[in-house]
């Protein structure tokens, strides 16, 4: 089919139309769609582009010589009857010359040369064919002579056997006749004797008659016995003669069948004849080449119909035809008319036999046979596979996947994936874990479609709605989070509401934990979450906003809107939580509530009196003014929200804070959001699971159950859960353990994959930056929120020259393992509201490990910052100490040039450095070699005095030069 457009041409080439369009555009042929017409010129340009892109040059070979050597075997019997194998080797050589159309003369010469070569090649091949035909004719003549000799010998042998058989039969007949004559003679004698006795008996007396009768009876019995023996002997001789005749007949039939098979084999047309040489033909389609390759020198390829008909005939004889008789001569005979010689069958059976120059037995080989083409031999059963369109697969890529699994999903070898990764700049192995993003890039690079797979994990077993559809939704208390800038009075405000003194117990008077409390008011229960206001506790404030229903934004009337105030507003807006503004410290003389309102309006928090939806309540945590109005507004907002949650259902909640207690183990503060949490329930929180062994309220009193919006402290988890993790109650501990272990493995795989992905980038960064100072730290904190905040604050201190390296961070006391880790990594241990035990302190003293304790996050950050400043390389500064004018120059042997100078400004010291200025241009910078006044060496010369000076490695001093004397000082740097 003629290809008139891009789609038809792509179908003809068996390739996607999109790939063909890209190749056409790369070749400079502008085609926009698959329906665009395609001319022969466009095809020629595409072909030229593809040849150039695959490295084709104008210096291609103009002449190709193909040599073919074909070795085959024939098998025949020699004069002694033994089978011999004769090797027949046919060598063919063909030269293809590419004509050059550059000039007419060159073309004619090439044409003439090609004709001469073709003629010489034709003559040579005809000579080879003639010699081969003579050889085959000679072999056939020898075979015919051998066959005639065998036939003559067989005829002579049969004649001798027939003569011997006739002689033997004649001898047997003569012997039988003699035995019969002897028996008849004996019977006649006995009869004559009996007659004589009868005659004598007539003359003898009567008393002898009984005796004579008995004797006659005995003689008759003996006569019958002799006749029976003679008859048996004659029958036995006849049977033996018939058996011998049957055996002779069988041998004769076998010999005739063998001779007939030999005659048929000789009459079969020879397939070894070499065909006449033909001019080179154009390349045939692959299918035609395959069909030709299936024929061999002695076994030409049969048509499909004939081959199909021959297969069932070989398995079972045709109905009605007699089964072939078993030939005694090794079953080498065949039915007439098969047209196949015994040589061919024997050669086929001996395919595995190696011959000189041919490892395949010389049978069933293609064009690339021979010693150099042994690896190219193909089995005749294989067939050519036409090129097919590449298969584009949809590969579902999970969060992490190994290289081997990714290759298996694409049905390719892992080495192909490794090659692509090497091109992308990553050296990987088949067992290396890739993250999802990298794996999807590799899949798309290999031409497949990458899809982010859904996790096939045990968490899918969790019913989406653990809460039953029939669970009754009941009103629940609101969860109120108090947020604001540090030192704006959030905790003091809560203290007044709770009638407690929490702020006084916090180190430094600032909140460093999330506090969860519930307060009973005349209008109902309210749960408060107190969040830190320090800038380091961003993640902690985000968790507070996530779990809350209403936000109380505390702003000091004397301070106004600060950075953490803005951050709290953004957290509340991101969670869609209504804001109630409490303007605190109105009892101070410098309080300015109106300025606070204006600043909050600029941040998008508009008071109700200005037409907004945020109530503003002026309060004082010190005097208690406005507290009732604040609670009234909070409960009013809760009524508007219509907060409800099921009570009679498995509990769900969120981890507000978690820590490792030395006596209690992992302890988590949980805010129940729905359902009822009871003591003894099996809970799952992230990678931690366990049974609730004890449950305490915010005052430390034991409680048996907690309903919605009630904060409790639970014990019994397997490890410290992450703050902000979701808590869920499961029916049995086995399912909780299974899901927790799966999450741990997934977290580890994701972490390793991300580390591997970032390894190359970090390596290149370190190479580019050169030497970077590292400050290794091990951080242990009392609760996870404080640990997170401290780690983030310290990591922000890193610069291009000094970097904070967090070797390990965890919750709990400082143990011996932490000290051993610090010894190995040369790290400093920071304990935030934790202490080291006795064994850890002793080990730290023995190894010289520095352990620092802090209760306030300010102090920890400031001291680490000071330590990093000490690690910075000092800054070098030049300080000019004096100016010197050269008045006279002296040449001193073995010393060099000495300048007689006058100190015009400042002071010149022996250890100072010098710049030489000529016409106010620096021509040399170096050091003083000597400083003398008169003949004495001096340490310094002050302004207004003369001196002699010589410089190291510089003698080009002239009168009128100026020396600028300076010193280099090092100045400590700070972050």
Swiss-Prot record:
Record family assignment: Belongs to the TRAFAC class translation factor GTPase superfamily. Classic translation factor GTPase family. IF-2 subfamily.
InterPro entries (alphabetical): DNA-bd_dom_put_sf, EF-G-like_DII, EFTu-like_2, IF2_assoc_dom_bac, IF2_II, IF2_N, P-loop_NTPase, Small_GTP-bd
Region (G2): 509-513
Location of region: G4: 584-587
Source domain of life: Bacteria
Residue ranges with Low complexity bias: 178-211, 302-330
HAMAP family attached to this UniProt entry: IF_2_B (MF_00100_B)
One Pfam assignment: IF2_assoc
Bilayer-crossing regions: none
Positions annotated to bind GTP: 484-491, 530-534, 584-587
Keyword line: Cytoplasm, GTP-binding, Initiation factor, Nucleotide-binding, Protein biosynthesis
Region (G1): 484-491
Subcellular location: Cytoplasm
Residue span, tr-type G domain: 475-644
Name this polypeptide is given: Translation initiation factor IF-2
Functional description taken from the UniProt entry: One of the essential components for the initiation of protein synthesis. Protects formylmethionyl-tRNA from spontaneous hydrolysis and promotes its binding to the 30S ribosomal subunits. Also involved in the hydrolysis of GTP during the formation of the 70S ribosomal complex.
Region feature (G3): 530-533
Sequence ranges of Basic and acidic residues compositional bias: 48-63, 120-177, 212-263
Annotated NCBIfam families: IF-2, small_GTP
